[in-house]
């Protein structure tokens, strides 16, 4: 059950409208993120706009201490069309505060760069992290990947779509209210025009792609494919809660290790809301999971 503390905070937050002009939506998304990116934690350093290759950059949040540090590759949410390393800056720095070199990827966005651009960027980032982590005294063979919403989709898709040698680099996945079966999500959310538009935009209107396991990675779950997964669903999430439950069920069916936690009464997007008790509870559980698996 949601706490009164969290209920009060959520009632005061501005509302983002996921419809309308893409430029205006992106501007509103980044403005809303300034509300979340206050009281940034103290870390070893933050390197902005690090170039991974032409057209692909990331913010790299560096922990304090000598290392070698484990690595987290983080994929921001935003319907494959919004968001940036800046919108998720505080979350990336919180990973670094906990001792993880954190690469918050600025993957290419739709509609300018529809599928498979963001997925290709994510897959490239895994190999890049393995090869370059030592630049920040970090361990290129102790990598976790994570993401929220669309970022959760990309995290799972990157693992299931990669060759075995690349897939083996990822020791764990942390997944917050992701979309893992876009075909089912689109059917379930017909009454939500904003989400329908985001889903369609990601695949450039070619909704047949929803059946592609690179787009809907739930269809690629099989024994030995995914590392241990930490799955968090938002209890008050009409968009993606069913996806989190379905992923857990699919992993259970193939005896693949996972944890599932549903934060009751909490909305989609809460992993940017660090003042929530539900956020702090999810983070405590995640630190324990990562300590065991990375």
State where each predicted segment sits.
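Alpha/beta-hydrolase superfamily serine-hydrolase fold, recognizing
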Residues: 1-294
């Amino acid at each position: 059950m949601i706490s009164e503390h969290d209920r009060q905070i959520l009632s005061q937050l501005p509302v983002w409208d996921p419809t309308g002009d893409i430029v205006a939506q992106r501007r509103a998304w980044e403005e809303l993120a300034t509300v979340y990116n206050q009281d940034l934690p103290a870390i070893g350093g933050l390197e902005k706009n690090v170039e991974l290759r032409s057209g692909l950059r990331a913010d790299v949040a560096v922990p304090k201490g000598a290392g070698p540090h484990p690595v987290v590759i983080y994929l921001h949410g935003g319907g494959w069309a919004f968001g940036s390393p800046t919108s998720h800056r505080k979350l990336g720095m919180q990973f670094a505060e906990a001792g993880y070199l954190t690469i918050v990827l600025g993957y290419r966005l739709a509609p300018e760069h529809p599928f498979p651009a963001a997925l290709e960027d994510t897959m490239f980032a895994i190999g890049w992290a393995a090869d370059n982590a030592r630049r920040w005294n970090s361990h290129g063979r102790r990598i976790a990947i994570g993401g929220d919403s669309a970022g959760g989709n990309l995290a799972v898709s990157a693992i299931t779509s990669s060759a075995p040698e690349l897939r083996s680099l990822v020791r764990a996945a942390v997944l917050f209210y992701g979309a893992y079966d876009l075909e089912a999500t689109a059917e379930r959310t017909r009454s939500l025009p904003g989400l329908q538009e985001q889903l369609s935009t990601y695949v450039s209107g070619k909704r047949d792609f929803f059946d592609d396991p690179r787009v809907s990675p739930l269809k690629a779950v099989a024994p030995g494919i995914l590392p241990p997964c930490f799955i968090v669903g938002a209890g008050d999430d009409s968009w993606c809660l069913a996806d989190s439950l379905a992923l857990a069920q699919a992993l259970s069916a193939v005896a693949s290790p996972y944890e599932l936690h549903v934060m009751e009464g909490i909305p989609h997007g809460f992993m940017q809301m660090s003042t929530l008790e539900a956020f702090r509870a999810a983070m405590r559980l995640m630190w324990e999971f990562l300590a065991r698996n990375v």
